[in-house]
C-alpha cells in the first residue's frame, strides 16, 4: 500500500500528504509544513511519470527517481529523446559522451550543454511552443530542474497529440516514496526557492498556443467533453468534427471506438483530478477534469493507429499484398519509406514478423514500431536484392572479359552477398567460373550457382594455400567440410589424402600451375580410395597364401600366389615346390624371432620369398650344368678345358690356380677311374645339395632339372660331385703352396740366423758393463781422498804467509774503510744535485695535496668552512677570454634568431608562391571544363557560370586547394608537431584511457607519429615520450616499488616491445646467438634438475635395456627419488653442466653492455632515477633488482627461452627446437633469472641449494652489469639536439598517418583536453580551437557522404596522408628578470665575494664585524681599479648594470654595511638564517665556484652548437633563396605561357621583327552586366549602364591588366588589376570584389573573361 494512500482498519481512505482529517486540528505552521510536503510528493510523482515515459520512448533504464534530476544534467538522455522524435535534427553520432563514460569518470563538461541545445532544437523542429522551454543553465547548472520536468510533460502530451509517443501516466497517489525521500526533495525545493510550474494547465496552454480563436476552441473542446459524457457516439463524432476543435484524421467508421476510448480517458482524468483536489487548496483549472484538445487528438490518433494495425493484421491473414499496401498507407500510422513496388516484400517480411511474435507467445497484433521496422527491413531486403542482381550481372561480365583481378573484385563486392573470396586465388576463380559459365545453357551464372561455386572454390583456394604453408590441419578441415562438396571422403584415409595432395601440389608447381583445381582434388580422393580398396583385397589374398602354406600343398600354394589381387610378380609354376619350401621356412623363422607361433608372412616377405626362390632355381641350374661340364672335361683329357670348367663361378670352387692345371686333370681323372672301376649304373639323374640345404635334381641327358624328386630316382655312380672335386683341388693346391713358400722366404731365414748370433755377442758386452758399474763407489772414494790432500796443503801455506806480514795488512784495511765512507758521502751529495727537480716536485706535491684536500672539502662538505671558500673565490673572476666567449655567444645567438626569423619569412613566401602556382594550375584545369560548356550558356543559365568556376574548389579532401582546407591541413600539422615535440600531452593521454585502448593507441598512432624512430630526430623525441610517460606512470600509478616487477606497467611493456622488435633484434642476436647455437649443437647436453624426472628417465632406461619391468615404483616423491645413488649422480652431472653453460651465457651478457640499444639503457636509467626519487629509502640493491627485471627478465629472458620466436637463431624450413633443447634453455634462463634477482633455491628446490653460492657470485656480476648499463649520456648529449634543431633542417619532418588515426587522435584530445592541459593558456587549447569539431572521414578524404554502415568506410579510414609538421609558435625570446629575492641574494653574494677575498676570517659574521686594515683596503682598491679598466673594454651589451658599477666604487667597510642590509632583507624573506652565521650564503658561493667550470664547458659547447646551427641556417637560407627565385621564374613562365596562348598572340605578325600591338577590350557596363561580370555600380541606375565603358588592356608586366572607366566618353579612373590577386581571392572564397571602390564584379566570371579573351582558354 502506498505512502500517499493508506486504508485504516475501518476501511476509510486516509488522506495524502498535506490533508487534514476531520478530527485533526493543526496550527498554521503545521499546515504550511504539510503543504510543502505535498508539493514535494507531487513533484516526485511528476519525476516518476517523466522517468517512466522516457524509458518507454528510449527503451532503456533511467536513474532512480530521486537521482533523475542529476542524471538529466549532462543532457544525454534528453538528446536521445530528441533523436527519438526528431532523428533528422539529433543524430546519435552528435550526442556528446553518449555512453556517459566521461561523465562517470570526471563529471560534467561544458560540452554536455551541446546535448541540451540539440534537444531544444528538436522540440523547435516539431513545433512545441517555446513557452515550455527551459534555459540551458536551468538543466546544466540545476538552477530550475522542475522547469525541465514541466517541459518533458508538455512534450509528452504534444507528441501524444501528434501520434509520435505514448501518453504519459498520472501516478499521483499510485507510487511510494519514503519520508526521507520526500523530506530531501522538500529541502531541495526550498534551497533553490523554485516556484513549481502548473503541470495541470499544460493542456490548456497548448490549446491557447494554437493560432485560432481561443474562445471558439475552448467552447468546442467543452462541447466534445459534454458529448462524451452523454455517451452517444454519433453526437460525440459530430462534436469532434467541429472545425473550431482543430481535430484531424477523423474517421466516421471509428466513432463508437472514439466514444469508448475518450470516455475512459475522461473518467481516468476525473479520478486523478478528484484525488488531487481533495488534498490541495490550490486554485483548480477547468482542464483538470476535462480532456484537452491535445488529449482528444492523441486519443483519436491512438484509435486510428489501433484500427490501422488491425487492418494490417487482417491483410496479413488474407495474404493480399494490395490490401496490405493500402493499410500501410494509412495516415494514422505515418509510416516512412513506403514503396509501391515493394508490396510483396512487405507481405513476406510482416508475415514473418507476425509469425515470430506468435511463436514467442504474444497474441496481440504488430505494433506501429514493429510495422515500421518491418517496412524498413523489407525495403532494405528489396534494395539488397536489386543490388545483388546488378552485382551478379557485373560478375558474369567480368568473367567473360577474362581479367582475373576484375573478376575477384566483383566477387568481393558486398552487394553480391557471396561467401568469402580470397584475392590470392584470382586465377583459380577466373578459370573455374569461366568453365562453369560456358557449360551453362544461358552462358550466365545465377546467384545460387555463384554461391555454391564460390564457396567450393574458396575452400579449394584455402586448401592450396594450406598445402603451400604445410598446414595439414587446415587442409583436412577443408577437405572434410561439406562446403567443399567433395564426395567419398573417408576419415581413416586422412593422411593418405594429405600425402597425395602434397605430391599433386608439387607436380602442379613443376608444371607452372599455381593451383590444383576441385576436379584435381576429387580425382586425388578417388585415387586414394581405390588404392586403399586394392590394399584391402591384397590383405585378403595374403591370408589365403598363409593358409595354403600351412596345408603343405605346393599346388594350392601356387594357386594362392597366382591370385590377381595379391599382385605378386615372378610366380612360376615349375618352382612351386621351392616356393612352398622357402616360404614355409621363412614363416617358421619369423615365428621363432617373434616367439609367436601364429605369425604370418606379409606381402613383402612373400614377394621376397618368390624372388629368392626364382634366384635359387637359376643358381641351382647353372651349378648343375657347371658340375656336368667338369666331368665331361675330365673325361676328354683336355687340361685347358678342365681348368676353364673348374674356374667357372657357377660351381663356386675355390683355390684353383692355373699352375696346377695338369695336376688337377690327372688327380680328377684318377678319381673318376676309381668310380668307374666300382661300376657304372648308367643313371641319367644327378642330385645336388645346394645352398639353403635343398636338393636339386639334374637330368644329364636333357640338361634340365627341378626341385621335386623324379619318380624312380637313382643317383649316377660315375659322376664326381662338387665335394669330391673340391677335395681334390684343395689337396693339389696346398702341396703347391708349401713348395712355393720355402722358395720365396730364403732371405728371411738367413737374416734370422744373423740375429741370433748378434744376440749372443751383446749379451757378453752387457755382462762386462755390469761389473764396472758395481765398482763405482770404490773408484770415487780413491779419487776424493787424493783431491782433499792437495787442497789442505795449499791453505796451510797461505795462512803462514799472512802471519808473517801482519802490520801491512792492518794499514791496507784502514785505507779501504776511509775510501768507502768518503765515497758514500760524495755519492749522496751528488744524488741530491742530480735530483733537485724531483725534490721541487715533491714539495709541490705536498702543497698541492693540501690544496686538493681543501678542494675536496669545498666539493664534498655539506657546510664548507669560510677559510676553504676564501681560497677559491678567485675562480669566480671573469677573465678576458670569458668576456670574449660571452660576447661571441650573445652575438651568435642574436644572429641565429635573426636568421631563423628570416628563414621563417622565406618559408612563408615559399608557401604563398606554392599556393599561387597551384592556383595557376588549378585555374587551367577549371577553365577547361568552363570553356567546354561556355558555348551552351543562355541568358537563363548564365548565373551558373560562377558555380562552374568554383566546382573544383568543392572537390578534394584535406589537401584540397582551398583556404578552408589549407587552414585545416595546417592546423593538423601544427597539432601533430606540438604532440611530437612536447611529450607531456601524449604521456598524460595514455593514462587517461583504459589499458587495452591505450595499448592500441600506442601501437597505431604514437609509433606512426614518430615514424617508428626511423631517424635520430624521431628516436630522440620518442625516447623523450617514453621518459616522460614512465615518470608520469611511476608518479601517479606506482604506490609500492615492487609493483614495477609484479605488475605490467604500460610504458615498460611498450619500451621492451619496441626495443625487442626490428630495432633491437639484431642486438639480441649478436649477444645471444653464439651461445644459444652452441647449446643447440651439443646433442649430448641434457639438463634435468627435477629429481622425479631424473628418476623416471632412469627407470625407463633400465627397462629399455633389460627388456623387463622394473621392480622400482614409478610414482615417487623428490625425497624418495634422491635416496637412489644413481639419481644423485645424474643430478650432480646436470647441475655441473647447467652451471657451465649458464656461465657462458652470463659472460656473453655482461660483456656486451655496449651492444644493448641506447634506448633500452636510457629507459633503465630513467626507471632507476624515478624510483629513487619517489622511494628515497629504497636501497641500491633493490633498485638494481628492478633494473635487472627490465634488462634481463623482460628484455633478454624470452629470447633465451624461445630463440626461434625472436629470430635469435635460423632454423630450416619445418625445423623446430627439440624438447630437450627447450628444456635446457628454460633451465638456463631460470638460473639467470635467479642470479639477476639474487634469488636462492629454497623449499621445493632445496636439492639445488648447492648452487646458491654460485648464484650469489653471479648476482654480483649482474649488479655491476646493471650499474654500467644505467651509465649513459643524456638524450641531448647523445643526439646533439636543442631548440634550434628543427629550424636548421632543409626538409621538415613528415609523418604518414591514416585518416582514421587523425580522427581518433582528435577525438581523444577533445575528450581529455582538460586532463592533459589543465592550464587555459596552454598552446594545445588554441590548436584544438583552430580545428573545431571532429571532422568526418568523408570530409577529410573528399568523398561524398555515404551510408554510415557503408562497408567501404573502414577501408576509407585506412587511407594514409602525409603531414609536413610545422611549429605554429615562435622561438621564445629572453625575458628580463624582476628585482626579487633572487636579485637581492645575487647582489649580496657578489659583495661577500669581494670582501672575503681581501679580509680573512673564520666566519662571515666575524669578517663583517672586524674592521679592515689599511693594507686590506689598499689591496681592495687596487683590485677594483683593475676591474674598472677591464670593464671599460667590455662591449655595451655586456656591460654591468649601473648598481653593479656603483658597488665597485665602494670601500670594504661600505660593502660590509651593504651586505648587512641585504642580509636583513634576506632574513625577513626567510632565505638565510643568522643563527648558523649565514652558512647558506657560503654554501651558495661554494656551489657557484663548483659550477663555474661546468658553466664554461657548457658555454663552449653551446657556442660550437650555435655556430653549427648558424652554418646550417645559412645553408637553409641559400636553399630557400634558390627556391624563391625558381618559383618566381616558374610563375613568370606560367603567366608568359598563358599570354603566349592568348588571342592577341594568335594574330599573324605583319612583318618579321615587329612587335605585335597589344589589343585592349572594350565593354559597356550593360554588356558586362548581361554577362554577369558586373553586378552593380553604386549611385548609378541600371538603365545608365549603357553610358559606362570599361577598357581592359594588358600591361608590359605579364599578369597585370589596366582597367579604364569612361562615363559618356569621359575618362574617369584607372585601376590596376593583378591576375594573381584574382586567383588569391578565388582561393579565399571571395565571390565579389570592388573596382574603383564603386563597381562590384563577380570574381569568378571576371577570371573567366580574362582567360577567354587574353589567354585563349
Swiss-Prot record:
GO biological process terms, semicolon-separated: caveola assembly; cellular response to calcium ion; cellular response to epidermal growth factor stimulus; cellular response to fibroblast growth factor stimulus; cellular response to platelet-derived growth factor stimulus; epidermal growth factor receptor signaling pathway; fibroblast growth factor receptor signaling pathway; fibroblast migration
Residues recorded with modification N-acetylserine: 2
Tissue expression from the record: Expressed in the kidney (at protein level).
Domain WW: 685-710
Subcellular localization: Cell membrane; Nucleus; Cytoplasm; Cytoplasm, Cell cortex
Domain Calponin-homology (CH): 44-159
Keywords from the named record: Acetylation, Calmodulin-binding, Cell membrane, Cytoplasm, Membrane, Nucleus, Phosphoprotein, Repeat
Main location: membrane
Keyword Phosphoprotein included in the entry's annotation: yes
Domain Ras-GAP: 1020-1269
Domain spans labelled IQ: 745-774, 775-804, 805-834, 835-864
Membrane-crossing segments per the record: none
GO terms under cellular component: apical plasma membrane; axon; basolateral plasma membrane; cell leading edge; cell-cell junction; cortical actin cytoskeleton; cytoplasm; cytoplasmic ribonucleoprotein granule
Modified residues (Phosphotyrosine): 172
InterPro entries in the cross-refs: CH_dom (IPR001715), CH_dom_sf (IPR036872), IQ_motif_EF-hand-BS (IPR000048), P-loop_NTPase (IPR027417), RasGAP_C (IPR000593), RasGAP_CS (IPR023152), RasGAP_dom (IPR001936), Rho_GTPase_activation_prot (IPR008936)
Annotated region (C2), positions in chain: 1276-1657
Spans annotated as C1: 956-1274
Modification Phosphoserine, positions: 2, 330, 1441
GO molecular function, one term: calcium ion binding
Role: Plays a crucial role in regulating the dynamics and assembly of the actin cytoskeleton. Recruited to the cell cortex by interaction with ILK which allows it to cooperate with its effector DIAPH1 to locally stabilize microtubules and allow stable insertion of caveolae into the plasma membrane. Binds to activated CDC42 but does not stimulate its GTPase activity. Associates with calmodulin. May promote neurite outgrowth. May play a possible role in cell cycle regulation by contributing to cell cycle progression after DNA replication arrest.
Domain notes: Regions C1 and C2 can either interact with nucleotide-free CDC42, or interact together.
Complex and partners: Interacts with CDC42; the interaction is demonstrated with IQGAP1 in GTP-bound and in nucleotide-free state. Interacts with RAC1. Does not interact with RHOA. Interacts with TSG101. Interacts with PAK6. Interacts with SASH1. Interacts with PJVK. Interacts with SLC26A4. This interaction enhances the chloride-bicarbonate exchange activity of SLC26A4. Interacts with SVEP1. Interacts with ILK; the interaction is required for localization of IQGAP to the cell cortex.
Record-linked PANTHER family: RAS GTPASE-ACTIVATING PROTEIN WITH IQ MOTIF, RAS GTPASE-ACTIVATING-LIKE PROTEIN IQGAP1
Protein name, entry field: Ras GTPase-activating-like protein IQGAP1
